[in-house]
UniProtKB/Swiss-Prot annotation:
The gene is atpH. Transmembrane segments: none annotated. It comes from Phocaeicola vulgatus (strain ATCC 8482 / DSM 1447 / JCM 5826 / CCUG 4940 / NBRC 14291 / NCTC 11154) (Bacteroides vulgatus). This is ATP synthase subunit delta. PANTHER family: ATP SYNTHASE DELTA CHAIN. Keywords: ATP synthesis, Cell inner membrane, Cell membrane, CF(1), Hydrogen ion transport, Ion transport, Membrane, Transport. Belongs to the ATPase delta chain family. It is found in: Cell inner membrane.
Length: 185
C-alpha cells in the first residue's frame, strides 16, 4: 500500500473518532505540536522506526512529544492502535494528513508572512481581517524573520504568493537591464 493511502485512512478515522467525542480541536492542537516535534527532532522518527524499542516506550515518547505527557485520551488511543498495527513508520504522515483534513473541515487557511524585522501584532491582525474577508474562513498565521529580504515582505497563503521584498525588486530591475542590454550589469 502507498504511504498516502494508509496515512489518509488513519487520519480520517482519527478525525471521525475525535468528532464523535467532541475533542477534534484538542486533538488538532496536539497533532500540531507533534508535527512540529517531528520536524524539529529527527531522532523522534528514528526512535519510532527502531524495532528494538517496545511499544510502551514509543507511546511514552509520542505522548511526551505531543504535549508533555498530558495528551487527550483520543490521541493516546489512536497512537496505541497505530503501534498495535505496527504502522508507526507512517505516524508522521498520519498526523500531517489529520491536520490537513481538520483544516479543510473547519475552512482554515494557513498564511505566512516573511519580513526583515518583527511585525507588529496590529499589522498581522489587519492582514488576517483582509484574508478572512476574502476566504470566508479562519486564518492561522506564521511569521518568519529573514534578513536576506533587505526590506519589504513576502506574504503566502495557499498557492498565492505576494513578494513585495526589496531583494525581489532588485532582482527584477537587474533582469530588465539584462534583457535590454543583453549583457550582465
Amino acid at each position: 500500500m502507498y504511504i498516502g493511502v494508509i496515512s489518509m485512512r488513519y487520519a480520517k478515522a482519527l478525525l471521525a473518532y475525535a468528532d464523535e467525542k467532541g475533542t477534534e480541536d484538542t486533538v488538532y492542537e496536539e497533532a500540531g505540536i507533534l508535527a512540529d516535534s517531528f520536524s524539529r527532532i529527527p531522532e523522534l522518527r528514528q526512535a519510532l522506526d527502531n524495532p528494538v524499542l517496545p511499544a510502551e516506550t514509543k507511546l511514552k515518547l509520542i505522548c511526551e512529544a505531543a504535549g508533555g505527557g498530558k495528551v487527550s485520551e483520543e490521541l493516546k488511543r489512536f497512537v496505541e492502535l497505530v503501534l498495535e498495527e505496527r504502522r508507526e513508520k507512517f505516524l508522521q504522515f498520519m498526523i500531517m494528513s489529520y491536520i490537513d483534513l481538520y483544516r479543510k473541515q473547519k475552512n482554515i487557511s494557513v498564511g505566512k508572512i516573511t519580513t526583515v524585522c518583527p511585525v507588529a501584532e496590529e499589522v498581522v491582525n489587519r492582514i488576517r481581517a483582509l484574508v478572512v474577508e476574502k476566504t470566508h474562513g479562519t486564518v492561522e498565521f506564521k511569521t518568519k524573520i529573514d534578513p536576506k529580504l533587505e526590506g519589504g515582505f513576502i506574504f503566502e497563503i495557499g498557492t498565492y504568493r505576494l513578494d513585495a521584498s526589496v531583494a525581489n525588486q532588485i532582482k527584477r530591475v537587474k533582469q530588465q537591464f539584462i534583457a535590454k542590454n543583453r549583457r550582465i550589469v
